[in-house]
Amino acid sequence: MKIMKQCRHMLVIWLTLTLPSFAQNVDSLAGKKIVFLGDSITQGGGYVTFTAYYLAKLYPQKNFDIYGLGLSSETLSGLSEEGHAGGKFPRPCLFERLGRLLEKVKPDVVFACYGINDGIYKLLDAERFAAFRNGVTKLIEQCKAAGVKEILLITPPIFDASSKAGVFNYDSVLTEYAAWEMMLKVSGMHVIDLHTAMRKARDARTEVFSKDRVHPGEEGHLLMAKTILTAFGVSVPFGTPATIKADPLYQQVDLLRRHRSSHWMNHIGYTRGNTVAPQPLGDTEMEAAKIQEKIDAIRHPK
């Protein structure tokens, strides 16, 4: 009975992940400079690495130039709840650094996953919702003005709490934010509906994706990556986080993501309580090229 139940759960997840939300393919990513923007979930980088890993593994003849540039606590709305970070500092807003990021990195493609911090964990409110919508619009406008060719909005992940009658569940706010994003129609911009995919997958299992309700664990990050890849028509083979992370290719891809993230974040500069002024990039890309050579050696064995 337990096996049958697990099979039904896997079927629900498979059905969720095999329906692309727009007509795209990996050729729109190959050979492009790709930036992932977001909050602590993106800065943690799990789903960014899983995405980069599968692209590298499944398409060894194509190159994908990926930069994970998320910042913990960040919003698009510019809002912050009282006592954030123990009252030490308000939430950072992307627009403090976005101009520098676009100028320095010059991305062709931008993925952006925001929303979970933007409602500041309170009831749905017209002003807060408007601030989020304005932030999304501003992000799209600034990216397009900087020459970004493709913008991919990723609807927010779920707030991983069980709904109880008469008790406020913050996920209801994120559901509204995601629904609004899904209605957007802008040239050069597409939306990947992570929220619905994650909600369906979570409802089909008993274990949480996020122990603290906000930050997904490895299984949640893998689901995020699969949702993104499926939107590009990628057929992702089954694998657990443990088996994937044991792959030497994954380890080098993760090393490259971490290396670039830390050095490029400092090169761009940011404010999160303290201000990190922009620093020289130095030999960051020379070292990145060495890691890429190891990745290519694994992808193209002699």
What are these regions (language model features)?
Residues M10-P20:
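Bacterial N-terminal signal peptides
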Residues L37, Y47-T49, G78-E81, G87-A131, ...:
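Oxyanion-hole/transition-state-stabilizing segment in secreted/luminal serine hydrolases
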Residues K33-L37, D65-G70, D108-Y114, E150-T155, ...:
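Structural recognition of the beta-strand scaffold that forms the well-ordered cores
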Residues A23-G83, G87-K88, L98-K106, V110, ...:
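Serine-esterase "nucleophile elbow" of acetyl-processing enzymes
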Residues Q61, E74-S77, E96-R97, A112-R133, ...:
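Serine-dependent acyl-ester chemistry module
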Residues A161-L194, E218:
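Substrate-gating cap/lid alpha-helix
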Residues K2-L11:
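Bacterial N-terminal signal peptides that target proteins for export
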